[in-house]
Swiss-Prot record:
Protein name: Serine--tRNA ligase
Known function: Catalyzes the attachment of serine to tRNA(Ser). Is also able to aminoacylate tRNA(Sec) with serine, to form the misacylated tRNA L-seryl-tRNA(Sec), which will be further converted into selenocysteinyl-tRNA(Sec).
Entry remark concerning the domains of this protein: Consists of two distinct domains, a catalytic core and a N-terminal extension that is involved in tRNA binding.
Superkingdom: Bacteria
Annotated GO biological process: selenocysteine biosynthetic process; seryl-tRNA aminoacylation
Length: 424
């Protein structure tokens, strides 16, 4: 959530930022609401001033034994007007707050201006795509051929866009989770968290999923509970309504969770395979940072995600997302995209974002500096480290052999009983 004082003082800059996000209409009504609020506030303050002034006069008259009944009657009427105006003022402030809840973050100055994903800027590439001496197969065909993925049975059990792993497929999924968590906790300094997979409305609002994106969420019927779309939601809210000590920053957390997304608006996209699922596993990284250091922390988080891809031996590239493609709560986002040989394209496998104080303001996460008065909002960062199903899909495609078998990346072998290959 943006700071209302900032929006008031920098309205033109906010309008430009929203226009760069293709969201220029979101501020419609703000100026009218703000003008109405100021008018009512001025009336309230004038009546309060009058009430205080006349109250003093009444006190003097009473001390002097004079009749103040008429003034007291007037003040009773003024108090009633103040009460009514204060109620109207509260309504306007709530309307402004509701409007702010639907306005996205302001992009950082280093974010390229662009309309959509076609304007994202490639930062770097790492690893050379493999030259196959046979026609590479899609990961779903490889997995079904090896008997480790079964989308047909998954569809019977639940419906489309759900995975079902067998044998070495389930083992590799678990190996990836363990490898990612071990790397982040033992080498990158994160503390592992196992959070709830169901959260309440306030928690979803704190990280920015609500109120704007409710249709993308799975809601429990009859409850104000939601299945999490990412571990970012519960982990960021660990410190909601808390004041942290400055010396405790930065805080690093990592968590494995299943994630649940309705994929509203994705009809016809990635209908096969593990790329776009209603349920998928992900290892998440979350940081709470001092505002002065948050962009250094973003670069570090990006490196942490890159390490996983490098250790797995998967070719990838890094994109700096443009203003038209960046997420709702992010001030800056790097996407990591892994090479998928069968499609001949890079596909997203991680997003690393600095949300600055946008989420912290919504969730009321602050820190106190030693020797200073007051508190400030922390900066929050989140990143995939990585999406597990997509990592497995990338391994199947990049490590496939002509006979249909798949070589297991060396770093996963200790988690898979020393196995070197998956074969029929």
């Amino acid at each position: 959530m943006l700071d209302l004082k900032y929006v008031r003082a920098n309205l033109d800059a906010v309008k430009t930022a929203l226009a760069n996000r293709n969201q220029e209409t979101l501020l419609a009504g703000f100026e009218d609401l703000e003008a109405g609020r100021r008018t009512v506030l001025a009336e309230v303050e004038e009546l309060r001033r009058k009430r205080n002034e006349v109250s003093g006069t009444i006190a003097v008259m009473k001390r002097e034994g004079k009749d103040a009944a008429d003034l007291m009657a007037d003040m009773k009427e003024v108090s009633g007007k103040i009460k009514d105006l204060e109620s109207g003022l509260k309504e306007k402030e709530e309307a402004l707050n509701e409007l702010l809840m639907r306005i996205p973050n302001i992009p950082h100055e280093s974010v390229p201006v662009g309309k959509d994903e076609n304007d994202n800027v490639e930062v770097k590439r790492r690893g050379e795509p493999r030259n196959f001496d046979f026609e590479p197969q899609a990961h779903w065909d490889i997995g079904e051929g090896l008997g480790i993925l079964d989308f047909e049975r998954a569809a019977r059990i639940t419906g489309s866009r759900f995975p079902l792993y067998f044998g070495d497929g389930a083992l590799m999924e678990r190996a990836l989770i363990n490898f990612m968590l071990m790397t982040h906790t033992t080498r990158h300094g994160y503390k592992e968290v196992l959070p709830p997979f169901i959260v309440n409305r306030k928690t979803m609002t704190g990280t920015g999923q609500l109120p704007k994106f409710e249709e993308d969420l799975f809601k429990l019927e009859g409850w104000e509970y939601f299945l999490i779309p990412t571990a970012e939601v519960p982990v960021t809210n660990i410190h909601a309504e808390e004041i942290l000590e400055e010396e405790a920053l930065p805080l690093y957390y990592t968590a494995f969770t299943p994630c649940f997304r309705s994929e509203a608006g994705s009809a016809g996209k990635d209908t096969r395979g593990l790329i776009r699922q209603h349920q998928f596993n992900k290892v998440e990284m979350v940081k709470f940072s001092h505002p002065d250091n948050s962009y250094d922390e973003l670069e570090g988080m990006l490196q942490n995600a890159e390490t996983i891809l490098q250790e797995l031996g998967l070719p990838y590239r890094v994109l700096n997302l443009c203003t038209g493609d960046i997420g709702f709560g992010a001030a800056k986002t790097y996407d990591l995209e892994v090479w998928m040989p069968q499609q001949g394209v890079y596909r997203e496998i991680s997003s690393c974002s600095n949300c600055e104080d946008f989420q912290a303001r919504r969730a009321n996460i602050r820190f106190k500096s030693k020797g200073k008065k007051g508190t400030s909002h922390v900066h929050t960062l989140n990143g995939s480290g990585l999406a597990v199903g997509r990592s497995l899909a990338a391994i199947l495609e990049n490590y496939q052999q002509a006979d249909g078998s798949v070589i297991i990346p060396e770093v996963l072998r200790p988690f898979m009983g020393g196995r070197e290959v998956i074969e029929k």
